[in-house]
C-alpha cells in the first residue's frame, strides 16, 4: 500500500526493481483485500497507482492458522504474517505498531523489515544491482 502513496519511497523502488533483481512480490488474497480497502484513503493518484502495481503481485494462498505459538500479533494481522511465513523469504511492512516487536527478531526465521531496511540489507550484502534508488 505504501507504494501507492509515494512515487519516491522505498516501497515504490521495490516494485520498480523487482524484475531486474529477480524478486517475486507476493500477496495473499487477504492482503490484497486490505489494500483495496485502505488505498482509497490515500486519494485518486494512489488508486491509479494501485491499479498499476497490483498486477505485479503474485497471489499466494491465505494461511489462517499457524502450528506454533503466536502471541504478539493482533488477530487482524495474523493472516498476513502466517501467509508470509508459509511462502515468503521476508515480510515487508511499514506497520510498526502491529509488527514492530517482530522487526527486531523476526518470526520463526522470517525477517520482517521496513522496505527501506530491506533495500539497505540487500545493498550491504552486495545483492542489489542498482546502487542508487
Language-model region placement:
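Acidic, PIN/NYN-like endoribonuclease modules and their adjacent C-terminal/linker elements
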Residues: 70-74, 97-133
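Acidic, metal-associated active-site segment
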Residues: 74-90
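Short, flexible loop segments at the rims of nucleotide/cofactor-binding pockets, characterized by
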Residues: 2-5, 66-72
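Short, structured coil segments at secondary-structure junctions
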Residues: 21, 53, 87, 106-108
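PIN-domain endoribonuclease scaffold, especially VapC-family toxins
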Residues: 19-69
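Short, well-structured N-terminal submotif of metal-dependent ribonuclease cores
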Residues: 1-27
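Short hydrophobic alpha-helical runs that function as membrane-insertion/retention elements
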Residues: 24, 91-93
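Short secondary-structure boundary segments
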Residues: 29-30, 94-96
